[in-house]
Amino acid sequence: MIKAILFDLDGTLLPMDQDEFTKGYFKLLAAKLAPYGYEPKTLIDTVWAGTAAMVKNTGAQTNETAFWERFSRTYGAEKTERDKPLFEEFYADDFQRASVFCPRNDKAAETVAKLQRLGYRVALATNPIFPSI
């Protein structure tokens, strides 16, 4: 008997053009951090490198630790520690604006709601590369 349904979020329940989302997300992030001395290209390259470090992470450390260790190699430990709150602020306040690059899928929302009404447990899976907010 099926008791639970697992859905992939990005690109399945949440329609998105990965390139469009990435460009929009980086534009927002770069605009937030430019006043603090972050040149956009270097910042974007460093975030990509941090993302690669998370993907390669074997579980020996958290993805967050993997990301910040790689970030520190470019910007240094002192600047990284000092500026972490800027990133937290970005994800708490500005990141929501990136939702324009992932439009709502009403059919997906209806499907999930119907499955829940029918008593199924519904789980959403995604790659945890963004911080929890």
Kindly give the residue locations of the regions a language model identified.
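Active-site neighborhood of HAD-like aspartate-dependent phosphohydrolases
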Residues: 1-7, 12-46
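Short, contiguous strand/loop micro-motifs
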Residues: 16-17, 55, 97-99
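Flexible, glycine- and charge-enriched loops at secondary-structure boundaries
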Residues: 19-22, 61, 101
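Alpha-helical elements of Rossmann-like donor-binding domains used by nucleotide-donor carbohydrate transfer enzymes
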Residues: 24-28, 70, 110
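Glycine-centered loop/turn motif at secondary-structure junctions
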Residues: 37, 76, 116-119
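A metal-dependent, Asp-based hydrolase signature
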Residues: 44-92
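Substrate-recognition element of Asp-dependent hydrolases with the DxDx(T/V) motif
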Residues: 86-103, 108-133
